[in-house]
């Protein structure tokens, strides 16, 4: 038997508000609690047998490591040339070696080239979070989160700020969910907390899988999330 409830306007407003709140929490949720050492050890043991095959799927022709190191060091020293900035963003967006790519990306490159001297003058105590906040405020649109996070990584890679994207974020969440089957999963990263969660996850895994490097764990998570985890 099916029952139909008659809702007045107040009930509808309350129900709509509740639904909107649930949608907001579903969209913005992050990892409920930090990864424990026991969980990190279990995940390290879980990925060890597949680590190298997954890692070897990474495309170094599309993302050449030597080129990355060159512009990364320029950013870390706070003196990237316009060419360094262009190369870095073309690399991140997967356009390396391409002559044609979206005009919106060309415009964003020019915008960041214009902003970098201002950042260098204004930032003062350039902690990773201050850097992230500065670029978030100046680019100030949701579509630039991954780019802002990448700039923050380039400047602060020595602080183990990861190259976050939807793939390694998805990989992290999928591995955590093998131990937390009821854990809600956020679809895409969108804020500073997500970056820190990924950073702490990678450090914890590395502590229990020391024959790997942080860079290798990053690439593994990218390929694992891209090729082995179902997108939701």
Model features per residue range: what roles?
Residues 95-96, 157, 223-227:
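A short structural micro-motif
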């Amino acid at each position: 038997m099916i029952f139909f409830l008659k809702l007045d306007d107040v009930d509808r407003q309350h129900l709509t508000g509740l639904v909107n709140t649930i949608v907001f929490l579903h969209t913005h949720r992050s990892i409920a609690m930090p990864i424990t050492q026991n969980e990190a050890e279990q995940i390290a043991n879980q990925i060890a047998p597949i680590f190298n095959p997954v890692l070897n799927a990474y495309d170094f022709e599309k993302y050449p490591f030597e080129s990355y190191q060159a512009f990364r060091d320029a950013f870390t020293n706070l003196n990237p040339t316009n060419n360094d900035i262009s190369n870095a963003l073309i690399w991140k967006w997967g356009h390396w070696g391409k002559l044609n790519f979206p005009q919106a990306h060309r415009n964003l490159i020019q915008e960041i080239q214009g902003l970098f001297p201002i950042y260098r003058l204004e930032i003062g105590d350039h902690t990773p979070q201050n850097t992230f906040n500065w670029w978030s405020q100046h680019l100030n649109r949701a579509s630039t989160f991954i780019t802002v996070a990448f700039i923050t990584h380039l400047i602060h890679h020595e602080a183990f700020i990861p190259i976050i994207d939807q793939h390694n974020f998805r990989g992290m969440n999928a591995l955590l969910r093998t131990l937390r089957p009821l854990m809600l999963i956020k679809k895409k990263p969108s804020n500073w907390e997500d970056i820190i969660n990924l950073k702490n996850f990678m450090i914890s895994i590395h502590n229990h899988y020391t024959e790997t490097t942080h860079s290798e764990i990053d690439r593994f998570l990218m390929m694992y999330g891209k090729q082995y985890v179902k997108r939701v």
